[in-house]
């Protein structure tokens, strides 16, 4: 597999990858604190970055995290009593806000000298999706965006194949391919019927415009197809949205041996 000119980093396993990425992020967080500014970490929910989040919590034990912002990529939308779409309840097992609170901020704050404040978790809002990119831009952009790829259709955030490559945050009708991938991402779903049919997401253009650095993380044998598609593309391929990493400033592909074995 070849990725053209984009850097590719290979690791023996997901733990090694997560530790290396956590080291890069921790260095940036420390530098931002010294400079007296916020550090925005772009985060996916789900499986791909779990080893990174765990390693980051270990590395940042005892640190001041009051300037850290967890900028999530997306959130599920469900119909409210009036039929209008609204963000999933954070208590729901699949809520991206809930994931950020429980699996990212929670472990980080448990050992922090100064925790991430409650207002330090950002998500796009279905009531005004475009405002999210404006907020990210006003904050100076995302210092490092962790990207993940859908296993079967290459979606990144909730952007399915064929999404506008320059698009901003939007309300996404989730295709069946993405919803099937989400059955594995959130295993408490008992059937496809339980997976929400809409989400609000950063757009592909948001990722490109707002990222100072981007790291596409591919871990495990289930991501072999994704690794092959992104590596062989050699550039952006509209049929595999995660290939947007090729368009990002300081974009890199990080994968473990199992994902690279395809």
Regions found by a protein language model. Give the residues of each.
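A glycine- and small-aliphatic-rich helix-loop capping segment at beta-alpha/alpha-beta transitions
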Residues: 55-64, 87-88, 161-169, 233
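N-terminal glycine-/serine-/threonine-rich phosphate-binding loop
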Residues: 1-41
């Amino acid at each position: 597999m070849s990725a053209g000119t984009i850097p590719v980093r290979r690791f023996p396993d997901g733990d090694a990858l997560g530790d290396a990425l956590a080291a890069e992020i921790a260095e940036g967080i420390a530098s931002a604190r010294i400079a007296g500014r916020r550090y925005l970490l772009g985060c996916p929910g789900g499986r791909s970055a779990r080893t990174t989040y765990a390693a980051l919590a270990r590395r940042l034990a005892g640190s001041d995290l009051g300037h850290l912002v967890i900028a999530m990529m997306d959130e599920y939308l469900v119909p409210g009593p009036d039929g209008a779409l609204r963000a999933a309840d954070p208590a729901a097992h699949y809520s991206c806000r809930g994931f950020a609170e429980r699996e990212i901020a929670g472990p980080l704050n448990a050992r922090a000298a100064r925790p991430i404040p409650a207002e330090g978790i950002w998500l796009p809002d279905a009531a005004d999706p475009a405002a999210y990119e404006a907020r990210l831009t006003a904050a100076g952009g995302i210092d490092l965006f962790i990207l993940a790829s859908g296993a079967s259709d290459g979606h990144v955030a909730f952007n399915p194949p064929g999404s506008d490559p320059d698009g901003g945050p939007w309300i996404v009708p989730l295709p069946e391919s993405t919803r099937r991938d989400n059955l594995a991402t959130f295993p408490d779903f008992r059937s496809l019927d339980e997976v929400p049919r809409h989400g609000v997401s950063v757009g592909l253009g948001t990722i490109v415009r707002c990222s100072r650095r981007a790291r596409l993380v591919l871990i495990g044998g289930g991501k072999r197809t994704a690794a092959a598609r992104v590596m062989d593309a050699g550039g952006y391929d509209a049929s595999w949205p995660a290939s947007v990493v090729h368009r990002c400033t300081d974009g890199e592909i990080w994968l473990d041996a199992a994902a690279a074995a395809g």
